[in-house]
């Protein structure tokens, strides 16, 4: 129900909450000047204007057991096990939406003389033809980047983090408290995310490899979770940046195929959802109108 930022301004005892519920009357009155002139030295902005910080500090839920499904007292998001969520979505799409799911390897991509992608030649299922191709191939950007040659625009001059080490931390006891907010703790060369799930915590260190070695990063992560060493951590290398455009010809990239800045999961999911909704809502009735849709999509998403 919030994001808690620890030690981002000062290296000790500095905490700021970004609550998901806006202060009462926030769209009508700006409370910032009053906070600055009256209470800034004694408490943070979120503490002064929102009750949600108190819910988080007390480990309370944003709703009660008496609330109906999706009925809330305070706004909240979901902490999900990504692997289980993918399985759920796949089953739902196949059984309820009639989607044909093909798991295969793309061996060759064929194009028309105008540059449009005509089909994907797969290893086990042969040619897969379509009018529109959505590139969800991850950072490789197989269709938009490798095939249609849309250049990558690096952002490493302002986003210094380029490496992440992620691990899973089980709860010691089944009754251990589960944080009802995401915790983001600043470190010397980056920041650590800490997300409480039902059966475990997802913890990872995002850092700049120019300012921290992998060995140092692992030690920092181990110290954070209270272990001598982290043995099962997964290392992820990434280059912050994005494709120059996200839609070219009859191919549109969504998610990592379009770009990646930092493992800011909520922001990334929002962009994926916004992209999918736009494609579904604005899908042109014929290929002749696709350039107009692509131009609008690129203007909005970039």
Residue ranges and their predicted role:
Residues 2-8, 106-107, 235-239:
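Short, glycine/charge-rich beta-strand/loop segments that flank catalytic centers
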Residues 1-58:
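Dinucleotide-binding Rossmann-like beta1-alpha1 core, especially the glycine-rich loop
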Residues 67-222, 276:
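Predominantly flavin-linked oxidoreductase catalytic cores and closely associated redox partners
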Residues 278-302:
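Active-site-proximal substrate-binding core of FAD-dependent oxidoreductases
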Residues 218-221, 243-248:
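Single, function-defining residue in the core of a domain
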Residues 186-237, 257-273, 282, 290:
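Conserved FAD/dinucleotide-binding core of flavoprotein oxidoreductases
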């Amino acid at each position: 129900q919030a994001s808690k930022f620890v030690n981002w301004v000062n290296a000790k005892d500095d905490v700021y909450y970004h609550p998901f519920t806006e202060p009462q009357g926030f769209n009508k009155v700006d409370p910032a000047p009053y906070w600055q002139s009256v209470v800034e030295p004694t408490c943070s902005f979120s503490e002064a204007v929102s009750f949600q910080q108190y819910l988080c500090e007390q480990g309370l839920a944003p709703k009660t057991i008496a609330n109906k499904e999706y009925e809330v007292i305070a706004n909240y998001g979901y902490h999900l096990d990504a692997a289980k969520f993918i399985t759920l979505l796949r089953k739902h799409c196949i059984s309820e939406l009639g989607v044909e799911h093909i798991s295969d390897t793309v061996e060759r991509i064929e194009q028309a003389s105008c540059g449009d992608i005509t089909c994907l030649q797969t290893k086990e299922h042969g040619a897969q033809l379509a009018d529109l191709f959505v590139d969800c191939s991850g950072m490789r950007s197989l269709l938009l980047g490798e095939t249609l040659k849309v250049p990558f625009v690096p952002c490493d001059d302002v986003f210094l983090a380029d490496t992440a080490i992620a691990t899973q931390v089980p709860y010691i006891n089944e009754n251990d408290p589960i944080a009802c907010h995401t915790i983001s703790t600043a470190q010397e060369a980056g920041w650590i995310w800490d997300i409480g799930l039902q059966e475990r915590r997802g913890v990872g260190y995002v850092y700049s490899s120019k300012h921290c070695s992998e060995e140092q990063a692992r030690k920092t992560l181990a110290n954070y979770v209270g272990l001598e060493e982290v043995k099962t951590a997964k290392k992820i290398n990434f280059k912050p940046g994005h494709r120059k455009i996200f839609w070219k010809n009859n191919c549109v990239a969504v998610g990592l195929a379009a770009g990646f800045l930092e493992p800011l999961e909520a922001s990334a999911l929002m962009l994926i959802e916004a992209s999918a909704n736009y494609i579904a809502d604005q899908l042109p009735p014929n290929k002749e109108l696709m350039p107009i849709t692509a131009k609008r999509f690129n203007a909005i998403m970039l």
